Amino acid sequence: MAWVPAESAVEELMPRLLPVEPCDLTEGFDPSVPPRTPQEYLRRVQIEAAQCPDVVVAQIDPKKLKRKQSVNVSLSGCHPAPEGYSPTLQWQQQQVIQFSSVRQSVHKHRNHWKSQQLDSNVTMPKSEDEEGWKKFCLGERLCAEGATGPSTDESPGIDYVQVGFPPLLSIVSRMNQATITSVLEYLSNWFGERDFTPELGRWFYALLACLEKPLLPEAHSLIRQLARRCSEVRLLVGSKDDERVPALNLLICLVSRYFDQRDLADEPS
């Protein structure tokens, strides 16, 4: 086998787009000054290319990398419903029809509700504020660790800061698709480690109603994650008459049958 110079081997992997023949230059050629002729310019390019290393290694500062990194593995399929827990096909079809009507109404009246003045106590968090959105949707009382006792606030009316703001149309109409996806992720993360609550259910329904189709990949992954988590929690519910069962069934139904994730659908009872 003939010996191939290292430079030739590199050129085989990175061929020249414009082959350049050796240039006849004057003895006074100085590569440190601007080129005066096309030949001097091409020769200068050759010299600079020869000085480039064959392999370049990026210097990465580990401190600048995100400390908290996660990988979401998408597993297919929901846990089958326990016997007697699965809704009928007719019930599922009715929910899809009603949900479609809600989505159309939200879309039609979005500009109207977006223009409505929010109450003075409503301050919507920024899109990237995960903790802020959890408190906004679920309330500071539920988000506070160990805070299970009744509120000591004796003022009349409902303290939404403590119990969470409901997904009013005047609120969700102000949320763009990026914010809707972010809040869906924040609440899904919360739900992944905790039980189902009515507050979660209301917000999940409202966010799904505002989620535009076709789904972006991130939203697609999130709603599948939501349906699977609902099926996991349903397995732990002790009675089919528990009020959580129809709410969990509804979310699984909407994800699977409205958003066309049919592999997650419940088999009709």
Swiss-Prot record:
Record-listed Phosphoserine modification sites: 70, 155
InterPro entries from the UniProt entry: GEMIN2, Gemin2/Brr1
UniProt subcellular location: Nucleus, Gem; Cytoplasm
One Pfam family recorded for the sequence: SIP1
Record bears the keyword Phosphoprotein: yes
Record keywords: Cytoplasm, mRNA processing, mRNA splicing, Nucleus, Phosphoprotein
Highest taxon above the source species: Eukaryota
GO CC, alphabetical: cytoplasm; cytosol; Gemini of Cajal bodies; nucleolus; nucleus; SMN complex; SMN-Sm protein complex; spliceosomal complex
One GO BP annotation of this record: spliceosomal snRNP assembly
Predominant subcellular localization, coarse grouping: nucleus
Subunit architecture: Monomer. Part of the core SMN complex that contains SMN1, GEMIN2/SIP1, DDX20/GEMIN3, GEMIN4, GEMIN5, GEMIN6, GEMIN7, GEMIN8 and STRAP/UNRIP. Part of the SMN-Sm complex that contains SMN1, GEMIN2/SIP1, DDX20/GEMIN3, GEMIN4, GEMIN5, GEMIN6, GEMIN7, GEMIN8, STRAP/UNRIP and the Sm proteins SNRPB, SNRPD1, SNRPD2, SNRPD3, SNRPE, SNRPF and SNRPG. Interacts with GEMIN5; the interaction is direct. Interacts (via C-terminus) with SMN1; the interaction is direct. Interacts with SNRPD1; the interaction is direct. Interacts with SNRPD2; the interaction is direct.
Similarity annotation: Belongs to the gemin-2 family.
Function of the protein: The SMN complex catalyzes the assembly of small nuclear ribonucleoproteins (snRNPs), the building blocks of the spliceosome, and thereby plays an important role in the splicing of cellular pre-mRNAs. Most spliceosomal snRNPs contain a common set of Sm proteins SNRPB, SNRPD1, SNRPD2, SNRPD3, SNRPE, SNRPF and SNRPG that assemble in a heptameric protein ring on the Sm site of the small nuclear RNA to form the core snRNP (Sm core).
Protein name stated in the entry: Gem-associated protein 2
